[in-house]
Amino acid sequence: MNSKVFAVLLLLALSTCVLSEKYCPTPRNTSCKKMNIRNNCCRDSDCTSNAFCCAEPCGNFCHKASDKPGGRRVDPNASCQTGYVYW
């Protein structure tokens, strides 16, 4: 009996974790036609209000978390500098 209760509680806890997962929103643009990019952030800690630092074609921007996957969070270990980056 105790193992059944434990299994139900474990399943409930795991489903809560999965349902609470947050993502970067899907970017509006799929490509960047500029000769530079603008990074407003390089990691989540650069953002305010618990926003995520999300990679987009024209740079990194802070966005409110989305329930739907589609965007990509910036790798905090990647080389990055805030501001305009020219190539």
Curated annotation (Swiss-Prot):
One cellular component term from this protein's GO annotations in UniProt: extracellular region
GO molecular function: toxin activity
Start and end residues of each WAP domain: 21-66
Keyword Disulfide bond in record: yes
Secretion signal span: 1-20
Statement: the UniProt record of this protein carries the keyword Secreted: yes
Tissue and organ expression note: Expressed by the venom gland.
GO process annotations (BP): defense response to bacterium
Localization: Secreted
Assigned keywords, A-Z: Antibiotic, Antimicrobial, Disulfide bond, Secreted, Signal, Toxin
Modification after translation (UniProt): Contains 5 disulfide bonds.
InterPro entries: Elafin-like_sf
Cysteines joined through disulfide linkages: 24-54, 32-58, 41-53, 42-80, 47-62
Superkingdom of origin: Eukaryota
Protein role: Has antibacterial activity.
Family of this protein: Belongs to the venom protein 11 family. 01 (wap-1) subfamily.
Name this protein carries in UniProt: U14-lycotoxin-Ls1a
